[in-house]
Amino acid sequence: MKFFALFIYRPVATILLSVAITLCGILGFRMLPVAPLPQVDFPVIMVSASLPGASPETMASSVATPLERSLGRIAGVSEMTSSSSLGSTRIILQFDFDRDINGAARDVQAAINAAQSLLPSGMPSRPTYRKANPSDAPIMILTLTSDTYSQGKLYDFASTQLAPTISQIDGVGDVDVGGSSLPAVRVGLNPQALFNQGVSLDDVRTAISNANVRKPQGALEDGTHRWQIQTNDELKTAAEYQPLIIHYNNGGAVRLGDVATVTDSVQDVRNAGMTNAKPAILLMIRKLPEANIIQTVDSIRAKLPELQETIPAAIDLQIAQDRSPTIRASLEEVEQTLIISVALVILVVFLFLRSGRATIIPAVAVPVSLIGTFAAMYLCGFSLNNLSLMALTIATGFVVDDAIVVLENIARHLEAGMKPLQAALQGTREVGFTVLSMSLSLVAVFLPLLLMGGLPGRLLREFAVTLSVAIGISLLVSLTLTPMMCGWMLKASKPREQKRLRGFGRMLVALQQGYGKSLKWVLNHTRLVGVVLLGTIALNIWLYISIPKTFFPEQDTGVLMGGIQADQSISFQAMRGKLQDFMKIIRDDPAVDNVTGFTGGSRVNSGMMFITLKPRDERSETAQQIIDRLRVKLAKEPGANLFLMAVQDIRVGGRQSNASYQYTLLSDDLAALREWEPKIRKKLATLPELADVNSDQQDNGAEMNLVYDRDTMARLGIDVQAANSLLNNAFGQRQISTIYQPMNQYKVVMEVDPRYTQDISALEKMFVINNEGKAIPLSYFAKWQPANAPLSVNHQGLSAASTISFNLPTGKSLSDASAAIDRAMTQLGVPSTVRGSFAGTAQVFQETMNSQVILIIAAIATVYIVLGILYESYVHPLTILSTLPSAGVGALLALELFNAPFSLIALIGIMLLIGIVKKNAIMMVDFALEAQRHGNLTPQEAIFQACLLRFRPIMMTTLAALFGALPLVLSGGDGSELRQPLGITIVGGLVMSQLLTLYTTPVVYLFFDRLRLRFSRKPKQTVTE
């Protein structure tokens, strides 16, 4: 009593305390960063290595395996995957959440150094690493286009000037430049002209290399001067290479231009990038795992004017894609929802109290509690994101509950004629323990969430802490500011009602009277109520088992990502045509704003596309509906598939795949894996629960297999090295010399002119100069035949791996898909040598599924323990917890009604309901116990009186929580797919709980009281507390 009196009788101190809390909250709000979700990115490091010309199998065995053995020893590696393709290997290391990315990078560098001696000596450079996840969607894509400059020049500007500068910006993890390659001088040889002149490809290569040499020439000195010697030993342009003499034939000079077409071009012509049907260079920017996306994007945007000044005016630098606008729009929607929730909650209070003066009190308590929470969020290192703001939106109904309970009880004493200050003191004393019990038991619900590990625990921690802090501040405010304002603002008389509100008051009285009559009937038919309660428990179990489940709601971020997968034998020219065709189909869709894509590199039959949709207020369809519409049109394109998926704020794993979910096959027997993967993929493609089924196993690429006749070669004076050098010179885009410029180095690339390599007959035109100087056709000592070869070799850990990716059709959930895959694997009878497991987001979903029931049980057990400690009773907590089954039924039925799967967001709603609905029972039980102790009432009389007496605050608190959550259900716009499942769960649970617990709680209270008396050693004692 003295504690409450201190704040009631010292209003200035109480007001200043509340002002201090508010000011700290405002300061914290201004300093909080903005993000779509809490920081949940796994630390990921990508290691890259190259060996030009090496086959995927060679790269896997000689480069990937030694590196994997060394990298696999690093502490904290949770997953290691690799992909080896023509001439390149990429290894993705995913670390545990608590692993520092910088420390992990040092360990990665040490592991690379340790493996260096085991790597092939012909590698042009050491393996490198980058602190970025290549499977993440770029946070921003910049494009360079020009009507004046070539693609090579644009690529040079992008890679030499723009990318290094952008990489230095805080938060940027990787800048990937695509769409072309660096400028180069390309030498396209005419094999027939070479044969006529008796010049081999090696002769040409040697002549070019010897003609372009950059070495120091020294200096001349006399007694007083020094001269640096400089020569014209370098050739820099195609025009300078063309007249180069490479051979003399019968005394006549054979120049390079006589046997080749020499052009200023690019290093790799098998690269193409486009934006909205126009050739472009792409800069794909990804953030560091721990970086804030909004801050990083803002920093890049601030740097763009400076970057524009470093490139010529004829080059157009544009932002093709930016993830931040939809994130900001989503947060603005949540903030609007929060404001609406506060307004609705205050309206509920006003309708029940029917007094503007009384309504001001909770109207002040709510913002003080919510704003003060921002200070704690800042101190905890949190951000303003969808989940933390949703926590504050839900907290609106919670924080007003405490103020309502205190205010309503004080108002009851005032209406009975008690003086204001005395009523404030007496009313607060009566409900102080009730408010404390409600708040502590509600916070207790979140303790299991705070202890939860992995990605779900990291994701929900900010939500749980934010809500708990808001409840804690609300508890402080309700026991200090609220009674003080009641004591000094309210009058010791029944407040005058406005005429238009009297009807609501009469309706409330009639409702209370009707409830009293129905409660009497219920208390005389307790067995029927018991059956209903048991039925809700059984219905909970059945609904939970049958409801579709997923990991996280499918978001509409306004960005789509597409992966092109074409026939494995497709040429680059045909693949570029497919890219253009797909881009045209997508660009013609009315919901699409921008399309950017590229193809080429080490995997000729693949490409990537990034699609920006129009803002949500300019389109009526969701991202998934747009994908469904485009899927029908894209399926008509022959020879290639484009798999679309909506970019999500959460993506787990480092695998680059063409769909949202992955199922990985592992085997130590590569032959078994290659045998079973097509069978499994074809089976999964027939399942109605899956869509866009595809695989990263590509072992059916076209290959021309040459078999040397070594005896013939020895007789003709030709060795294998000379023959292989011929093929590399002719078809390998061989980099034979380096052109040094002040800002960069460029290559001279030699190959047979593509005009002469359009079919297999090009091999018949190749010849080798033997040791006697004679031209020997390749066909004299080699035979060739087409064969199949892998385009890529994939590992996970140290096992061969193949990942099958899939999306979900409209109306199907991840639980449906995972169950269907498990059944299919069983039906196929896959041998034990091939192991299947879900990967990425699907793997986290499986782990979360296994822990959800345990988490709910842990939350209930924690609440029971806290209530047992507060009430010093084993029985009363059970009475209070009996309210939960009805809430669970309501929540699950509401999800079914709205066709929403049970996700991590819905799980939060269930946890919140555990904390919300028990408040009704706490108010009933508290007053019933008080009536038994001091009113000498029987248990039935006590609980009946408690139910009627607390009917108004129960209705107020429940409706406040319901109206606080209702805007989440009704909200549209950006991010609504995250908010709606939470609102649906809470509203459904509250409605069902309110209908049932007003009757089941009294019955359970009486049941346990009779049970207590039956087993009590002192059966005549009414109350044991």
Swiss-Prot record:
GO molecular function term, any single one: xenobiotic transmembrane transporter activity
Pfam family for this entry, one: ACR_tran
Subcellular location: Cell inner membrane
InterPro entries in UniProt: AcrB_DN_DC_subdom (IPR027463), Acrflvin-R (IPR001036), Multidrug-R_MdtC (IPR023931)
Residues spanning the membrane: 3-23, 333-353, 360-380, 387-407, 431-451, 463-483, 528-548, 853-873, 875-895, 897-917, 953-973, 984-1004
Main subcellular location: membrane
Keyword set, alphabetical order: Cell inner membrane, Cell membrane, Membrane, Transmembrane, Transmembrane helix, Transport
Keyword Transmembrane part of the UniProt annotation: yes
Binding partners and assembly: Part of a tripartite efflux system composed of MdtA, MdtB and MdtC. MdtC forms a heteromultimer with MdtB.
HAMAP family: MdtC
NCBIfam families in alphabetical order: PRK10614.1, RND_permease_2
Name of the protein in its database record: Multidrug resistance protein MdtC
